[in-house]
């Protein structure tokens, strides 16, 4: 009788590990496709760049070196980044002359990916509690606060938006790098 339960538990553990790895592979594929779509949409948002507006928002170094992060922490980092990029682009971009349809498409893509991550990470509540209070999370939130503050200080003018657009494009490249962490 005990052997039957042991075998049953072993099958469950094997199945759950396989299911998690499949989820990460699916997540990696969907994230990379989505991020490339977002990059394509960002390229369509034209404007003039004024080099005097450039600034260093100081993205946390931890996200620059994803090989040191666990898969679930990587997924949490991507989720925080996507949520904050979404919030940035919900700001007042009317001074840019950007096509609202393109911005809406970008927001839709970001929202879908955030929702997908939410579903996948729903089972990781204990890790979420650790992640929420981590220095990486706090660093990311401070980073995006600086981006939002920069736009506000520059009164959401088109030059500031072009700087932020370039920074978000860089964020998407970082997310692609983080996404490769799911292969390990």
Curated annotation (Swiss-Prot):
<dbReference type="GO" id="GO:0008285">
    <property type="term" value="P:negative regulation of cell population proliferation"/>
</dbReference>
<dbReference type="GO" id="GO:0002281">
    <property type="term" value="P:macrophage activation involved in immune response"/>
</dbReference>
<dbReference type="GO" id="GO:0032689">
    <property type="term" value="P:negative regulation of type II interferon production"/>
</dbReference>
<dbReference type="GO" id="GO:1904465">
    <property type="term" value="P:negative regulation of matrix metallopeptidase secretion"/>
</dbReference>
<dbReference type="GO" id="GO:0042100">
    <property type="term" value="P:B cell proliferation"/>
</dbReference>
<dbReference type="GO" id="GO:0051607">
    <property type="term" value="P:defense response to virus"/>
</dbReference>
<dbReference type="GO" id="GO:0002286">
    <property type="term" value="P:T cell activation involved in immune response"/>
</dbReference>
<feature type="glycosylation site" description="N-linked (GlcNAc...) asparagine">
    <location>
        <position position="50"/>
    </location>
</feature>
<dbReference type="GO" id="GO:0043330">
    <property type="term" value="P:response to exogenous dsRNA"/>
</dbReference>
<dbReference type="GO" id="GO:0005132">
    <property type="term" value="F:type I interferon receptor binding"/>
</dbReference>
<dbReference type="GO" id="GO:0071359">
    <property type="term" value="P:cellular response to dsRNA"/>
</dbReference>
<protein>
    <recommendedName>
        <fullName>Interferon beta</fullName>
    </recommendedName>
</protein>
<dbReference type="GO" id="GO:0097696">
    <property type="term" value="P:cell surface receptor signaling pathway via STAT"/>
</dbReference>
<feature type="modified residue" description="Phosphotyrosine">
    <location>
        <position position="24"/>
    </location>
</feature>
<dbReference type="InterPro" id="IPR000471">
    <property type="entry name" value="Interferon_alpha/beta/delta"/>
</dbReference>
<dbReference type="GO" id="GO:0071636">
    <property type="term" value="P:positive regulation of transforming growth factor beta production"/>
</dbReference>
<dbReference type="GO" id="GO:2000552">
    <property type="term" value="P:negative regulation of T-helper 2 cell cytokine production"/>
</dbReference>
<dbReference type="GO" id="GO:1905604">
    <property type="term" value="P:negative regulation of blood-brain barrier permeability"/>
</dbReference>
<dbReference type="Pfam" id="PF00143">
    <property type="entry name" value="Interferon"/>
</dbReference>
<dbReference type="GO" id="GO:0006959">
    <property type="term" value="P:humoral immune response"/>
</dbReference>
<feature type="signal peptide">
    <location>
        <begin position="1"/>
        <end position="21"/>
    </location>
</feature>
<dbReference type="GO" id="GO:0071549">
    <property type="term" value="P:cellular response to dexamethasone stimulus"/>
</dbReference>
<dbReference type="GO" id="GO:0150079">
    <property type="term" value="P:negative regulation of neuroinflammatory response"/>
</dbReference>
<dbReference type="GO" id="GO:0002250">
    <property type="term" value="P:adaptive immune response"/>
</dbReference>
<comment type="similarity">
    <text>Belongs to the alpha/beta interferon family.</text>
</comment>
<dbReference type="GO" id="GO:0002323">
    <property type="term" value="P:natural killer cell activation involved in immune response"/>
</dbReference>
<dbReference type="GO" id="GO:0071222">
    <property type="term" value="P:cellular response to lipopolysaccharide"/>
</dbReference>
<dbReference type="GO" id="GO:0008811">
    <property type="term" value="F:chloramphenicol O-acetyltransferase activity"/>
</dbReference>
<dbReference type="GO" id="GO:0045071">
    <property type="term" value="P:negative regulation of viral genome replication"/>
</dbReference>
<dbReference type="GO" id="GO:1990786">
    <property type="term" value="P:cellular response to dsDNA"/>
</dbReference>
<keyword id="KW-0325">Glycoprotein</keyword>
<dbReference type="GO" id="GO:0005125">
    <property type="term" value="F:cytokine activity"/>
</dbReference>
<keyword id="KW-0202">Cytokine</keyword>
<dbReference type="GO" id="GO:0035458">
    <property type="term" value="P:cellular response to interferon-beta"/>
</dbReference>
<keyword id="KW-1015">Disulfide bond</keyword>
<dbReference type="InterPro" id="IPR009079">
    <property type="entry name" value="4_helix_cytokine-like_core"/>
</dbReference>
<dbReference type="GO" id="GO:0005615">
    <property type="term" value="C:extracellular space"/>
</dbReference>
<dbReference type="GO" id="GO:0007259">
    <property type="term" value="P:cell surface receptor signaling pathway via JAK-STAT"/>
</dbReference>
<dbReference type="GO" id="GO:0045944">
    <property type="term" value="P:positive regulation of transcription by RNA polymerase II"/>
</dbReference>
<dbReference type="GO" id="GO:0045581">
    <property type="term" value="P:negative regulation of T cell differentiation"/>
</dbReference>
<dbReference type="GO" id="GO:0060337">
    <property type="term" value="P:type I interferon-mediated signaling pathway"/>
</dbReference>
<dbReference type="GO" id="GO:0071676">
    <property type="term" value="P:negative regulation of mononuclear cell migration"/>
</dbReference>
């Amino acid at each position: 009788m005990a052997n039957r339960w042991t075998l049953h538990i072993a099958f469950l553990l094997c199945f759950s590990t396989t299911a998690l790895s499949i989820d990460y592979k699916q997540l990696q594929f969907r994230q990379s496709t989505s991020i490339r779509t977002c990059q394509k949409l960002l390229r369509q948002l034209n404007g003039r760049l004024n080099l005097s507006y450039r600034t260093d928002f100081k993205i946390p170094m931890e996200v620059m070196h994803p090989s040191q992060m666990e898969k679930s922490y990587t997924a949490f980092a991507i989720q925080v980044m996507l949520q904050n990029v979404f919030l940035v682009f919900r700001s007042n971009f009317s001074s840019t002359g950007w096509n609202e349809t393109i911005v809406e498409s970008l927001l839709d893509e970001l929202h879908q990916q955030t929702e997908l991550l939410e579903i996948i990470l729903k089972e990781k509540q204990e890790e979420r509690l650790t992640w929420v209070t981590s220095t990486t999370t706090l660093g990311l939130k401070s980073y995006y606060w600086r981006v939002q503050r920069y736009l506000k200080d520059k009164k959401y003018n088109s030059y500031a938006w072009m700087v932020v657009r370039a920074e978000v494009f860089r964020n998407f490249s970082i997310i692609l790098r983080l996404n490769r962490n799911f292969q390990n």
